[in-house]
UniProtKB/Swiss-Prot annotation:
Gene Ontology molecular functions: protein serine/threonine kinase activator activity
Family: Belongs to the TCL1 family.
Annotated protein name in UniProt: Protein TCL1B4
Pfam families: TCL1_MTCP1
SUPFAM superfamilies reported for this sequence: Oncogene products (SSF50904)
């Protein structure tokens, strides 16, 4: 009989993320997430409409830099201070904006969340 292949279980996305420092968020389990990239585009693979699309890539990190990068202070200051998971694929920011969870994956040990600002 062939052995079954087991893949590591993907953890559930965080229930909430609270900004602790400029581009660093902490979830309910004390895990640190860094806002690694913010994209603003009218042509995004996550957007189906012709409009400006804002996506943020959050990476779960075990080791963080001591000081925030100077660029992050300028680039990420519009992100909400907290995100709370409202439904299976929607986060609500402290600013009452909705962010759709478009990807939750793990690549070489780094867990990633990709959130897209939902223009309802």
């Amino acid at each position: 009989m062939a052995d079954s292949v087991r893949f590591p279980c993907m953890p559930f996305p965080p229930c909430f993320l609270v900004c602790t420092r400029d581009d660093i968020y902490e979830d309910e389990h004390g895990r640190q997430w860094v806002a690694a990239k913010v994209e603003t585009s009218s042509h995004s693979p996550y957007c189906s409409k012709i409009e400006t699309c804002v996506t943020v890539h959050l990476w779960q990190m075990t080791t963080l830099f001591q000081e925030p990068s100077p660029d992050s202070l300028k680039t990420f200051n519009f992100l909400p201070r907290t995100w709370r998971l409202e439904s299976r694929n929607t986060y609500r920011g402290a600013d009452a904006m909705h962010w759709r969870l478009v990807n939750h994956s793990q690549f070489y040990g780094t867990e990633e969340l990709v959130l897209m600002l939902d223009s309802r």
